[in-house]
Structures are given as C-alpha cells and as structure tokens.
Amino acid sequence: MKKLIFLLLIILLPVASFGATEITWYGHSSFKIQTPNGKVLLIDPWLTNPANKEGKRHLKELPKVDLILLTHAHGDHIGNSIEIAKETGAKLVATYDLGKAIVKYAGYPEKQFGYETTGNFGGEITLLNGEVKILFVPAVHSSALEIPDSPKSLIYGGNPGGFLISIKNGPTLYHTGDTDLFEDMKLLGLMYKVDIMMVCIGDKFTMGPKRAAIATKFVNPKMVIPMHFGTFPMLNGTVEEFEKEIAEQKIQTKILKIKIGETVKIE
C-alpha cells in the first residue's frame, strides 16, 4: 500500500483552491502526476531504477497512462517508456527530434506520437481537453540515444530539455530534466508562478546541491522536490547538502522530501 502524505498548502500555494493533484516519485527523475480529473502523466518513467526496490511492482500496478513526457534520450530517462506505452496506449510528449528517434530506434508505438504531442523550446501545447498545458523548456545537458545493436551506437536525440506543466485547477510544475544551472531559469521565475520544482541535485552528470540551490532561487517556486541523486554511488549529491545550501543562501522555498514510492496529494 502506497503511503499518502496529505499536505495543507494554504500558506504555501496561492489562495485559490486547487483540486486534488497527486505526485508520486519513483526515484531518479521518474514521476507520476495524476490530475484532479484523473488523467495520468509520467515523466521520465524509469520505475525499475536501482534505487526503487519495488519498481517491478510499481510498474505492474500502473493505472491507465495518458501521456509519457521524456526530457531527453538517455536510457535512464527513457526507462520503461516503451513497455508502458505498448501496455497503456500512452501518447509521447517530446521534442520532434527526440520523439522521431525513439519511435524509429527504440520501438515506441508510431501511432502514439505526432504533431499533437510534440513541440520545441519556448512552445506550449494544450492536451487532454485542456486539462494540462505543457511548455517545452531548454536544459544544459546531452541527448544521445544508445542502441547497442545499431550500426551507430549513439543516435542523435535532439536537444535535452525540461517541462513546465500547468494543470487545470491544480499546480504549475517545473521538471528540470538533467541540466546544469543556466541564467535563463530566471525567466521562468519572472514569467510564471511555479508551485513545485523538481530539480536534479546528484552532481557529476548534472548540477549538484549548490548549483541546484541557485537554480531554485532563480525559479522561486513555492516548493522544490530534489531528484536524480543516489540512484548510483556516483550521483553523490544529497538532500542534506541541498538543504544546507538552501538555508545558507536564505532561499524561502520549502523542500518537499518524498520517499521513493510515496505519493503527495496537493489540494
């Protein structure tokens, strides 16, 4: 049975009352978002990552999935996307280059990706009958698709990115994807009221705790969820270090610490 953490966000979120939006973290950068109307989005769904000991069960217990959002082409972010898509019929939300590569070389069902669910950085799409708006946001990383049996071992997967997800009668979420700190993050803080930011803190392949804290300051969300840490020993940035940096930089954002497999319900 999944643990549910019920959060009262009267102070943390705007005065207008949200419907219930549920966020589940599966470890690494993998999240499930369930909207107030019951629509299900998965972001970078690698449920069976090494840090998630219940990953196979979580994968089996997934409800119908409406959308799979992929930030870039690396295998630890494509994860279980292909099998989930084949099982549930979930449509793929990705940049055009990334989507085409995943369909052609990784086996994502072709009929589940098209112009309806694709875009590029700075562009916004509205899906699920207006239930969600998704803005494509750039990231500073890489995005090669590794196909061991292909004549080319690395396939071009477009540019890496993140997503700003606005949920009708719910919060606005920013998933950074894998990235370093970059100054244009300030624009998100200026142009949007971000309620929850999912930020990578693991270091080595992304920014670590110090730079992630500065990114949080730039975006200025109400709450932040640290991610992409501890999956492998080399991703050694910690939540404790992130907390320390947030405190030292006098950033007012609340850190929302979710255990792997837990769900937070935002009302």
UniProtKB/Swiss-Prot annotation:
Pfam families named in the record: Lactamase_B_3
Presence of keyword Hydrolase: yes
Top-rank taxon, per record: Bacteria
Gene3D superfamilies documented for this protein: Ribonuclease Z/Hydroxyacylglutathione hydrolase-like
SMART domains: Lactamase_B
Alphabetical keyword list: Hydrolase
Disulfide bonds, paired cysteine numbers: none
InterPro entries: Metallo-B-lactamas (IPR001279), RibonucZ/Hydroxyglut_hydro (IPR036866), UPF0173 (IPR022877), UPF0173_UPF0282_UlaG_hydrolase (IPR050114)
GO molecular function, one term: hydrolase activity
UniProt entry tagged with the keyword Hydrolase: yes
HAMAP family with a match to the protein in the record: UPF0173
Stated family: Belongs to the UPF0173 family.
NCBIfam families: PRK00685.1
Protein name: UPF0173 metal-dependent hydrolase THEYE_A0282
